Amino acid sequence: MSTALEARKAGFATGGATLVHNVDLAVAQGELIAIVGPNGAGKSTLLRMLSGDLRPTSGSVRLGDRELSSYSPRELADRRAVLAQHINVSFPFTVEEIVRMGTGDVGHRKAGALIDAALHEVGLGEFRSRDITTLSGGEQQRAHFARVLVQLWSSEAVRGPGILLLDEPTSSLDIRHQLDLAHTARRCARNGATVIAILHDLNLATRFAERIVVMHRGAVAADGPPSTVMRPELIGAVFDVELTVQMDASGSPFVLPELTRA
């Protein structure tokens, strides 16, 4: 399978601090990856470099057969969709208007069908006329997820499989909608999209992803399938907690933190 996105010795430094250093990461088309790690590990900085929002101060990032920095903003928007960690909308856009912002080079009828499908996918079909500023945090997050789905699907309708980058997409969601989002992302990957998501819930990550990248102090501490990455000695050291890792009935690792820390 071809490489969709690749970081080569990529790093980012600012204000005398190195936030990410020497990251090698090749992601294949259709692959589904979760990035995990403690606060300040460099996860969001790495994702912003992979999206083109930040240009590496060392090394490089490639999208397909070109340097990521060689793409124009329009070209990037046509090839990858990004759900940022923090999205503040102060104006009273309706949910449908927010989702419509994701449509690209598709006709009006096709755009309408994609918007309908995305709103149904995130369970906001009855919210399309609502002012987004009146929604709960979780509802707003689902509306923005619908927007990036429309962007991804619009791109795929014209250029084939794209890239979906998600920065803590479940942070405001209840457990049902966390699982719904994970299932949607998996379907996107099965349809050929490349999906990379930052997740804080380690157990959701082990079920969600076929590959986990563990970040620690700006570097990749581990990279591989959940069964090999989720080792108690590694995860405990990275997060500075005592924990055990068991296998659930499906054979997936399940992380159990100890609650008796002194």
Swiss-Prot record:
InterPro entries: AAA+_ATPase, ABC_transporter-like_ATP-bd, P-loop_NTPase. Its EC number is 7.6.2.-. Residues 5-242 form the ABC transporter domain. The keyword Endoplasmic reticulum does not apply. GO terms for cellular component: plasma membrane. It is an enzyme of class 7 (translocase). CDD domains: ABC_Iron-Siderophores_B12_Hemin. It is found in: Cell inner membrane. The complex is composed of two ATP-binding proteins (HmuV), two transmembrane proteins (HmuU) and a solute-binding protein (HmuT). NCBIfam families: PRK13548.1 (NF010068). Part of the ABC transporter complex HmuTUV involved in hemin import. Responsible for energy coupling to the transport system. This is Hemin import ATP-binding protein HmuV. The lineage of its organism: Bacteria, Pseudomonadati, Pseudomonadota, Alphaproteobacteria, Hyphomicrobiales. The gene is hmuV.
